[in-house]
Amino acid sequence: MVPVIALVGRPNVGKSTLFNRLTKTRDAIVAEYAGLTRDRQYGEAKWQGRTYIVIDTGGISGDEEGIDAKMAEQSLQAIEEADAVLFMVDSRAGMTAADQLIAEHLRKRNKRSFLVANKVDTVDPDIARAEFSPLGLGDALPIAAAHGRGINAMLEAALGIFPRDDEGEEGEGEAEVVAEGEEPKRVPGPSEKDGIKIAIIGRPNVGKSTLVNRMLGEERVIVYDQAGTTRDSIYIPFERDEDKYTLIDTAGVRRRGKIFEAVEKFSVVKTLQAIQDANVVIFVMDAREGVVEHDLNLLGFVLETGRALVIALNKWDGMEPGQRDYVKIELERRLMFADFADIHFISALHGTGVGHLYKSVQAAFQSAVTRWPTSRLTRILEDAVQEHQPPLVNGRRIKLRYAHLGGANPPLIVIHGNQVEAVPKAYTRYLENTYRRVLKLVGTPIRIEYKGGDNPYEGKKNSLTERQVNKKRRLMSHHKKAEKKRRDKKR
């Protein structure tokens, strides 16, 4: 499971600077859910091939209202959700009363905490360690977040306590080579044992719990329910029509005898972890409310992680025909960026349309993990280029030579050629749509990566042989004589 790291500390100690450095915010998946997260900011980060989630909390001043009152706003929940805490202090300002209150709270919560002394670029690290040793959280890890100093050592300490998942998900990452002439194939992964892992996500009160109960209803064969390693998330294997699935529930469903009691409990961390761990995401929206901003935020995270997607519009049965038409128009307008996903209009309460979700889940999963030979992908590229050539760059045509599969879940197609760094985004979208249409991909994002061929002669001066030099001299002499004869003739 993806580790969760919370950044905690009083105001202006550099939490946001460290957050931006860890997540590389320009490229990172950063989601801010106002009103739901109480101003906490969540981001996905990677270090040495490991993925983890970072929570940037608000500053804690420790004023007369007390540490608990302040932390209840945002930081207390972040600490509870986190696997480990990076407690940041300011080396320049030294230890304060607020630092002592926060350290005391962390010790009481018995959380895995690492003391991080920021801004050591102008302070001796040994002095900083001695300054904060009374906090009782071990030796401080000295860093300079603004300049990136000490970050690797800090991450080594914080992430080293978690087991490395070296196995990963089969079907992800680098794809194995499919021999020329072979048919596309799907390679069995861990999901063959536990079934396709489905995460049902969405805003609070859109009907996630009702849908979970409906999918695990009396007509289904429930094998067992087992608490996962994530806080309050439950992994529930079940079968339907002899197909195996594992439902990742983030709504707090608990089994009591034959009754599943649903407790609506929204947690951004649980949602993000469920998305990361799933093969397919069923995204639930409330048809009566249409598409709202929080839906777009969550959908954006799903697309960035590359997970296969099925959209379910719940509470459809109670709507008038005019309302339904309006919602469909809004969906088409606002969800253009996810137009590859199947949309189902359902009633989780009455079961209407729920059974059709499984067909889309299967299709999305197959599209996400199927592998194609290089010959097929290259032929599709050649046909696409012949139909619509890439633009000219400085008078030279961009050349796309061949394509191969670079990964799956989501499919990654690597295209080799010349001047590929100049390929416009519009042309990349054209290629994505072409591959999606020809390969009949549904329910999964598709990614295209370009690789250019290095010019072995770049930066090298061409040296001529003696024979070539003599030939060049003769040609130049001949050219001069011909030019002189032409001028004399004009006179």
UniProtKB/Swiss-Prot annotation:
Positions with biased composition (Basic residues): 470-491
UniProt: GTP 1 binding residues: 9-16, 56-60, 118-121
Coiled-coil features, chain-numbered ranges: none
Residues at which GTP 2 binds: 202-209, 249-253, 314-317
Disordered: annotated span: 164-191, 452-491
Keyword Methyltransferase annotated: no
EngA-type G domain mapped to chain residues: 3-166, 196-369
Compositional bias (Basic and acidic residues): 182-191, 452-464
Keyword Isomerase: no
Domain KH-like: from-to ranges: 370-454
Domain of life: Bacteria
UniProt keyword terms in alphabetical order: GTP-binding, Nucleotide-binding, Repeat, Ribosome biogenesis
Bias type Acidic residues, positions: 166-181
InterPro entries: G_ENGA, GTP-bd, GTPase_Der, KH_dom-like, KH_dom-like_a/b, P-loop_NTPase, Small_GTP-bd
GO biological process per UniProt: ribosome biogenesis
GO molecular function: GTP binding; ribosome binding
Task performed by this protein: GTPase that plays an essential role in the late steps of ribosome biogenesis.
Quaternary state and interactors: Associates with the 50S ribosomal subunit.
Recorded family membership: Belongs to the TRAFAC class TrmE-Era-EngA-EngB-Septin-like GTPase superfamily. EngA (Der) GTPase family.
Entry protein name: GTPase Der
Species the sequence originates in: Azotobacter vinelandii (strain DJ / ATCC BAA-1303)
Lineage: Bacteria, Pseudomonadati, Pseudomonadota, Gammaproteobacteria, Pseudomonadales
Gene: der
